[in-house]
Amino acid sequence: MAKIAILAGEPSGDLIAAQLMAYIRSKIKNIEFIGVGGPLMKQEGLSSFFDHSNLSLYGVFQVIPNIPKLIFLRYKLIKYLKNEKPDIFIGVDAPDFNFYVEKKLKQSGIPTFHYVAPSVWAWRPKRVHKIKKSTDYIFSIFPHEKPLFEKVGIQTTFVGHPLA
């Protein structure tokens, strides 16, 4: 049985990841999804390590007091995923949380994918180098992202915007 670890940290990511999970399940029947997500991902069969609401924090006044909790959850999640040994890991959006998880899993030999890359073309373009260290493959939602990521050596497939 194939095992895919997938993580979405907010409601929009839950929707996008659930759509991706449904598509993958239509192609691969014998599959297990583990990771972190919300109700839509759980409907698609996700065995969630914790609910994504723990990561759905917006603005400095929500994030700062929760930093110790976020670091602890991230540590526990990485340990759990390394122990579970998924065939691949897919981080959906939530780059501040996902790229660190991806980097640690990539270092342990788990292939990492990222769906909905941050807008490096709009601001903080040097992040592309950090992304390269974190993820093996990007599913881009905008056509102009593909050459940008491939220029620095990140394999990229343009898949279109999931909500379009």
Regions of interest found by a model, annotated:
Residues 3-164:
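Active-site and donor-binding regions of nucleotide-sugar-utilizing enzymes
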